[in-house]
Each structure stands twice: as structure tokens, then as C-alpha cells.
């Protein structure tokens, strides 16, 4: 049981074991509860020795009490155990835990009343502030005020939200102001779930505590009366000091601020944790070529906060690195500001510099100065008849830039009509005379739409326009002669026009997103035929009239008209293309997100596969249209990258759809953080008075792609029979199917919606990809006005919201759901009825059923999923089992009647009810009012091969709790089909296993129950079976059997078995042959783990047999003993089953290894290598050494540097100076004790080091001895470069600093073997260099440095040979081409082949097809030589 079982002895132990865990319960306290409590106290950084006295228990209760409200169940259990133990110490008679808690509460109330009475007697005049943890009470004593749950809650929230970002440190400092070590430990305990971070923090505290003990040696002899002892490092950390001692130290005269000291240690540890969680160095923060200066400054200062440096060093970083790492544009401006410029001046000066807009402005200014001749050439290439117009700013009137890039103050009034009171975007004149022959405004009065601007690849807004066609337009004035001004309309409002159809005038919407023209009821002559078309509300029936004449603003067309119940008249693309109307799609003006390939990778170079003629024609048409809209651009042969494309027909359509196979590019593209981790759920929506659902049209094609990345999206449309070279394109916008598109689009959309959300807090916007749900409690008129405002806001940024998918009335179709004003459901689900099912069909069926299960209770898919087991092709035929057919029929019946869910009401409580369906399947409903489900679901996951219902029930509850936190932000109250007694039994034995929230019993059959129970203590009088099994890995033969305490034994032979199966077989044998009560002893942790979890079913047949035997028994006790430790029965049965099965391994090197470890304290890797020991044995030798358990092993060989680099530093031990040199690449150490820390001694040591090893660079700190003239002279003479670390930054000397600690640790292990420190230092150097193995290559440091130096020499020699080889050139022939190619560079020459490099391509050429000649250079070639003749040719 361990040392902690001795907390209670004699009569007190008897009293302890009589106290019940719960009122009326069967279980009572045991010694194991004391052992558990002592381990828990160690985990919470409390001294377990405090359990031995009543006062100690009081201290523990005071420490734990503030955490009871916010703490876990474990803290509450610990508090209950300590309170009961306190009553036993005080000899207060209690029957159970509840009575003990009541007694403790009475005692605490009495003491509290006494304190309050004393405070009242003292009067108000002497009251002091209650804002600090240590305050003065009424008697003038300094008492501790416990840290509040509110403070703890704030600290936990900071850690959970910020995840150890730099902001955590100042927050911790603020929250822990004036705190005692006890308070600080309580704060750390509340975030104990972050195990890795807490372990790092613990290591730092231990190091600092050890350093404190070294700097403050303990006073020898007894303390004088009345004098308090000096605190040790562990006292400051609160592990060996009481709260009263901490208060005395903090309030003494002179005070010892143990709280502040401990806080400083914790902050040191937090700094290390922050560095781990924010691994980017300040040196790596550089401004991108297109990154705005503001964003660069944000990143710089965020990283600066994480740097472990003083304020002076951070100031130096800000002054130098901020300017040094800016991009060239910003750097020029910043240097012009001079030294000492404030951050405000820098940001003002660099505003607008560095981003794409700045580049565009500079380019525009450069182009405006281009010569007229060059401009004329460009005009001819672009098919323009006249000279280009220079762009002119509406705001300041200057040429060379646009108004949106203008830096001058904004001119008042409208830029379109000149009137004040509104801006151009709100101008009412902009829609006048749509599609007229002349533009609305005269030359010079407003913005002129030049043909140049219409042709740009990145227009700023979508504009339908008429192509040059039958009726050319008049010229727009003298200045614009030769240039065509096309009529156009900006889509600030819906493009409604008057059209003439069959002599009737009607108003219709120009809709480039619609394939067909659809009109409301209109009488048309001629015959018609019926047709069904798809719309947003489902399918509608229409009448189709062919060859109908239509006139739009004087333009005539003839085509098909559909007449039916459409909400608005639509002129579709079938008519718009005839009159030459095109749509200029906007590319959003927001800044592009920079994208890169993964390091070391190049773009895709996948060849285009052959395509059929119809697919090539379809792709040509699609790409022509995309090019006109600016989505793609043609490219030349200079782009070496390619991605294959293909085409498929749209569902239920004759139209084609272009698909690009971006799999190869996706592999090579950098990874993106998934902006949205899941889809929003309608059960989490709050009921709203007004709702609208919008869809963003051509979502990805509205966001620009990073210009530098566009080249990697290149693709080719081939020609039939290779008639002509393929036409090459690249994307200008986010492509469909590329891995970065979703993340970049979501990020861009969030930034665009942010200002609208801030200005309209009453509007709730759910955004997922291109679907927007907008809800509010406004009246419908106000709500729709806000929706139009939102649509206009999106349009400014280039995102359209088509009317076709603008849903104003319920039911709303959103994210696969159907939303009604007071309820929701999934969109109608039709299960297919097939004669034969393929794997793909079953996969789709299971997907549909899983989707339906969130609102239809009782859906099951277990047997359908079993049909998919194994590696099967998608087209394989699967025959349904009888169980799967029954499951499918039940699901059809469930889906027959529609089921609805309701919306969430924050004022009401959430309730979750769980039912067991059988066959490891569970269903649940989450609701606030009975029979009105918010959401339903199912659970059919099996956590392990061996399980039981109680364990599965806890998994179901945890799934529901997680789901509820995601959707509603809180956990529901649970109603579970399990009796309290069953849960109590499980909880008593397995209380560490899981957590469960508040719940109540519901009598809904089938109830969950435990089928058998293992005893916790041996059964007196029952026979004891020692069981064991063994198997041979090669032959798969094995034995299993048992030996009993009464002399019985049985051994059986097994075939095709394993060690684990044999161990289980032995237990099954013992259960089979034993009586109703039995004790079983095994040495298998595997078997023990399976059976102790009390499974009632398993996937393994053998385990099912064991379960059947267990259910039949009245009592079973199962115990474990370690193998091969000479334990009686276990040793006997082990010999019986091992005979002829196990191979015996004689470890005769153990004694020698132990002897060497006692002398050198070498690590386990060195012993395993030198003495041929298994790692587990070598680790056991280290573990049993008391001197090697101070701290874990240091890691070596983690840094990869040049062979000649050494780091030097001086460290102090026992009042003496040790100079240490570390070879960075290998970790090899040279060290010695020097008489003084002077430049002369340091220079002498450097010369000794250079005489032993090749030293090219030494890296030191800025100490006076290292910066002295003597060291500089020594370095100059030995031709050594000296480098210095960053001031006050220990990380710059990280290797030697860590080696200093390692060296001191080894010295501590061997110090008692040496009389003088200098001897111990050399012993420690020897041990480190030759007796510790690990790191790169698994060598010792001595072996590694020799290997590195030898490799360096070989590499240099090889490099010389390579250099000689590279002086030769190779002419070669390919297998099919008889022409000699070259000259190529010779990389390697072998017996049968040569390796060459030709135009960056490396090739292997057979020796017989290569001619090798020396490259003498052209300067040696005369007129008559071969080189000269070749040049002439």
C-alpha cells in the first residue's frame, strides 16, 4: 500500500473503517482511500504529511474550500475524505461522510462568528483594506484571505481562451497581486489539465528552488528562541511550508516576500511555455512584399511579447529589427524618418505603402509616363482603334491614379452629379436611361467608362453590357474618337427593364444566372408543350413556347419563352446572349491572401489526358466565357506548370461543367487553418420574428487569388488530333477544388461582414461558406430594409446575392434544413428502393440516415454499416443480410411521418434523455419542453473490443455534453435508464475512470445493469488458482494452465496462438474447472485490464466464454503479481507453461553494467550498447540509482551546426570558476577550473582548445573576460572568429547554458569520489563525453565529434573531386534522337554510365552514348579550334 497507509494506526484506523462513504450505503472507508488521498495531495502540490494531524487536515481543507464551487469531482471527493479524517483525529463520532461534513461546517461557523465578533468590538476605525490576500484582523493579527472563485474563474478563462499566448503572463501577474504561495499553487491546480505545460513549469520551479537553496545555505545548529527559520526553496514553492509560516515571512521585519519570489519563478516558467506555444522567433518576422505595414507591426509586437528578454533588449529590437525586416518600400520611408521616430509617425508615413494598392498606384504612374509609340502598339494588340485615355482621379483631378487610391482629403459632395448631401454610390441618377444609345452624363462632368476599363481583367463591379454588334454606338466626344463607349449598368439595384414580347410590354429582370427566360402568366399565340423546371421552392410546371420574338431597348431576338408561376419575370441567358449582353464579374477589391507552396516543392507538372471532341468544345466555350469575365487569363509557353482538366454533364441537363483535378497542386500547397470547425445547427438558433436566407453568387470566383500563386493553377485545353497547340490558361480567382479556396473565402467573407455586424448588433448573421442566415426581431419592413443594406454592403466588395436564391418567406431552405417560423426539420429524405445495392449505394444510404437521425429518433445503421466492412470497390455488389433489410424497413417506417424540431430558448433549462436500443446502439433527445425536441441523435460507437453498457452509457453522455457545449454553450441535465444502485457500484470501483454531469433515473426499459461483479478482497476459504500462458512467436505453438494452492495442476497445448491469447485461455481454464467461489492470480496486465473493466460482451470469442463463466460464479477475486519475481505459485506455473515454449535469455552482463554505473553513472543507452542489455533492464539499473533520480536525462545532439563552432561560458560552483567549451554539433565538452575570470586565463584556455580540436568560430557572451584584448589577440593568432550573443538573452547561449547544468548534475553524482573540485570536473567531463550515449546517431559525445570531423574531411576531399569533375562537359545522344546534344555539366562518372545536368534537368546517360571533353573556356579557343568553328556555325 505504501508509506501513506500509516496515517492512522490502532483505534483511529478502526474508527476510520467504520465510517460509511454514503448515508445508508454498504461501502465504508478503507486504507486505500488514505493512499489515494495522499497521491492526490501530491498532484495538487500539497504535503501528504499534513494528513497525519488534525491541524494539517484543517490546512488542507482551507486550501481546497475555495475550489469546491468551480472544481472537479476529484477535488470534492478529496475534500470529503480529508473532512472525515479530521473528525477521526479529533475523535468526533460520525457514521458517514455527510455527518462529517456537517460537523466540520459547525466548527468553521463557530470560528467565523468569533472573528466577526472580535472585528465588531475593535470598531470601524481600525479596519484595513480587504483588497489584499493578507489583512489585519480585529486583534491586530495578520490573517489570510482566501483567493476568490471569481479570480480563479478569470484565470481559467484566460488560459482556455488564450492557450498560453503572451497575454497570459501579464494577466497572471495582475490576478496574483499580493498572493501567497498557497494562493499561487491553487491557481496552478485549476489549470492542471494542461499536463505538458504544467510539467515544464514544475521543472522551472524545481530548478529555481535548487538555485535558491544554493545561494541561501541553511544556518548550522539550532535556531535562537523566537526566531523563525529561513525559507528553503521548497518552502517558497509552498510544498513544505504552512500558510502561517508564509504569512510570517511576508509580514515580518524585515519581510521575506516569498509570494513575490514564487510568482517570479512561475513567470519564468510561463515564459518558457509561451515560447513553446509561440515558436516563431522575432528574427523571422519579416514584412511581405504586399503586406500592409500595419499588419506587419501587429505580427511583430505579438511575437515581441513572447520573447524572453528585458525591456532594454525589447527596446533595441523595436528600434533596429522593426525597420530592418520591413519590405524595401517601407524601409526607404522609415529610414528617411531618421533615428528615434515614434511608432505613430512610422505607421502614418507607411499608410497605404506595401500593399497591392500601392503597387497598382506606382505601376499606373509608371504607365502614364510611357511613350506614345509603346502605347500605340498596345492599342493595336488589344483591338482598340484610338489612343488609350489616361486614368484620372474624381477626387483631386490629377492623372495617374483612381479616386479610391487618392491620398488627398476627400472632396465634398457626389462625384457623379456634383451635388452635396449624398455620395456617388447613393446617387439617384446612375440608373437613368438603361440601355440607351447615349451615356447619361457629358464629357468632363462625371466618370467616363472607357473601353480600356471595360476590358480589364479585374473590374470593380458587375456590369452587363452590349457587345459591338449590329448598331454601333456614337462616339463619346472628340477626346474619345476611335474608342467605343458601351452602354452599361452597375448592379447597385436590380436590373429591371421594359421588354416587348409578342406586342405586349412587361417589366422583367435581366438575370445572367438563369439559363432560361421565364415569365408570369402572359397570353402568347401558338402551340406550347408542358415542361418542369427547378426553382428555389422546388419544381414548377411551365408552358414552353418556341420561336417567340422579343425586343429589349431596340435589340431584337428570337428564342424559347417559358410561362408559369414565377415570382418575378426573368430574361435568361438564352435571350441575353443573342443581343450581345455580357456580365463583367467583379474581382473583390479586398487584399489577396498570400499563398505559398510547401517548402522545397515546385508546382504541379501533370500532363493533360486526351478528351473527346464534345468535351473539348464544351471546355472551350466555358473558358471563353470565364476569360471575358476576368476569372481566368491566357498564358504563354513560359509557364512550365500544368493541371489536368475534364468535363462532366450537369445533373439532369445537357449542359457541361468544367472540373479541374487539383489533387497534385493540393499536395504541394501550404496547409491552411480550417476557419470554421463545423456547420451551424438549427437547434442552436433562437426564435426570431423576421428571417431571410441569402446565397452569395459565384462565391469563390469573386475573391482574387494571390498573383504570385496564379501560375501554379495553369491548365491546358487540348485540340482534336493535336491539330494545334493546346490553349493555356491560369486562374485569377479562387478555383473550385483547390484546398485553399474554402479557408480564404471564409476569412474574406468574415472580414467583410465584420463592420456590418458591429453597426447592426440587432441582426444575427450565421455564415457558412456562401450561405447566409439573417434573423432579427425587427418588423418585417425594417428587417427587409436592413437586408437590402447588407446586400449593398456585400456588393461594394464584389459579392452578389442573386434574387433567384434570395428567400424572403418561409419555409427557408438552409444548409440542408427546412426552417419554419416556430419549428425546423431536415429537407425531405427519399430512401431509394433498389433490387441490387453497390458499396457506393450503401455509403450514400448510411449518409442520408445519419443526416436524418438528428431529428428523427430511433434511426439505426449498425447492420447496414457491417455490409461495408473490408476493402471493397465502390461498384461491388452487396447483398443485404436479413438484419440489414429489417433495419432499413424500420428506418423507412420512421421517415414516413415528418418530424420537426423547435428553436432554443435561453431562459429554459436543457434536458437530454437517453434510451438503449440494443446491439450497442443508443438514441437520445435534447429538449426544453416535453415532446418538443430541439435535436435528436444516435450513438453506435464501440470504444474498445470489450465493453459493457455502463461504460457505453458514460460515452453517450460525454458525446451529448460535448455536442451541447458546441451548439448551446452549456451541458444539459440528463435522464438516464440506469438505477442509482447500479451506478453507485460502478462509481465506487471505477470512480477515476470518467466524469458524469447532473442526472436522474428514468425507468425506461431496457435498463442498464452490471451482470457480474469482481470482489475487491481475496475470498477466504476459496481455492486459489495461479494461471499463466506462453507462446512461441515463430512456431505459434503455446501452452496454458494453472496450479492451485491445494496441489491441483493442469496444462493444455495450444496451436496458432499468441502470448495474450494463452494468458486468457489459462483464466478461462481456471474458471471452467473451479467452484462457485474462486481466487485467480495472473501475471498478465493485458488479461487483468480486460476483465477488471467488467465487460458483458466482446468481439473476441474467448473473452465471451470468460464472461459466460464469470456470470455463472457467485464470487470471483482476480489479482495480479509481477512475473519472474520468485512468487510461489506463479513461478511453478510459469515453469510448466514455459517448458519447450519460451527462449531463455541469460543476461550475464547485468553485474558488470551495475558496477560501471556506480562508478560513472552512465545513461541507459550507453549500458544497453556496451553490455548488450535489453533497454528495459538498462533503464531499471538507472531507476534504482538514487543519484540518477534527481531529474530526467538531458537531451543531446539536437542542434545541427557547422563542425568548427564552439560555445564558451563561465559558470560557478562551490565558489570557484569553471570555464566550459561545448562543441555545438556534437555536444562534446572541454572544461576546467580556472583561478580567476580574467581575459588572460580565458585566452590561455582558448589556445589549449584550438591546439586539440579544429576551432573556426567561438560563440561567447559579453562578459569582460571574453571581450578583453587578450582573447581578441588569441583569436586573431589562431584564426578564430569570435561571435557574441544578444545582451541579456540567455537563449543565444542555449547550448552551453544547458551543458553547464548537465555538467553540474554529473559533478553532483561523483563529487563524493573526489577530494578536489577540479578532479570532479575532469571526471564529469570524461563521463559526459564517453559514458553517455544518445542524440544524433545514438553515439556518445566523444564518438560523435570524431565522426563529425572525419566526415567533414571526407566531404571536403569529395568536394575537390566534384569540382574537378565539373570542369568537364558532356555531349550526349538520346535513345531515339540521333542529334548530339550539349554541352551538359558532368556530375558523376561511373563504369557504365554518367550523370549529367542539362538545363537544370539531371539525366543518366549510358557511357557509350556520351563524349566527355575538358572545358578550357572560350578565352583559350583560337580561330582554328573546334570551339571557334562551332561558334561560326
Curated annotation (Swiss-Prot):
Region (Interaction with Gp41): 7-31
Lipid-attached positions, N-myristoyl glycine: 2
Region (Dimerization of protease): 487-491, 535-541, 574-586
Taxonomic superkingdom: Viruses
Marked site: Essential for RT p66/p51 heterodimerization: 985, 998
Domain Integrase catalytic span(s) in chain numbering: 1199-1349
Region (RT 'primer grip'): 812-820
Residues binding Mg(2+) 3: 1209, 1261, 1297
Residue numbers spanned by region Dimerization/Multimerization of capsid protein p24: 277-363
Renumbered residue ranges of the record's region Interaction with host CALM1: 8-43
Binding site for Mg(2+) 2: 1028, 1063, 1083, 1134
Zinc fingers (CCHC-type) by residue: 391-408, 412-429
Motif (Nuclear localization signal): 26-32
Phosphotyrosine modifications at: 132
GO cellular component: host cell; host cell nucleus; host cell plasma membrane; host multivesicular body; membrane; viral nucleocapsid; virion membrane
GO biological process, alphabetically ordered: DNA integration; DNA recombination; establishment of integrated proviral latency; proteolysis; symbiont entry into host cell; symbiont-mediated activation of host apoptosis; symbiont-mediated suppression of host gene expression; viral genome integration into host DNA
One Pfam family linked to the record: IN_DBD_C
Motif (Nuclear export signal): 16-22
Misc: HIV-1 lineages are divided in three main groups, M (for Major), O (for Outlier), and N (for New, or Non-M, Non-O). The vast majority of strains found worldwide belong to the group M. Group O seems to be endemic to and largely confined to Cameroon and neighboring countries in West Central Africa, where these viruses represent a small minority of HIV-1 strains. The group N is represented by a limited number of isolates from Cameroonian persons. The group M is further subdivided in 9 clades or subtypes (A to D, F to H, J and K). Resistance to inhibitors associated with mutations are observed both in viral protease and in reverse transcriptase. Most of the time, single mutations confer only a modest reduction in drug susceptibility. Combination of several mutations is usually required to develop a high-level drug resistance. These mutations are predominantly found in clade B viruses and not in other genotypes. They are listed in the clade B representative isolate HXB2 (AC P04585).
Protein name as catalogued: Gag-Pol polyprotein
Annotated organism of origin: Human immunodeficiency virus type 1 group M subtype G (isolate SE6165) (HIV-1)
Gene giving rise to this polypeptide: gag-pol
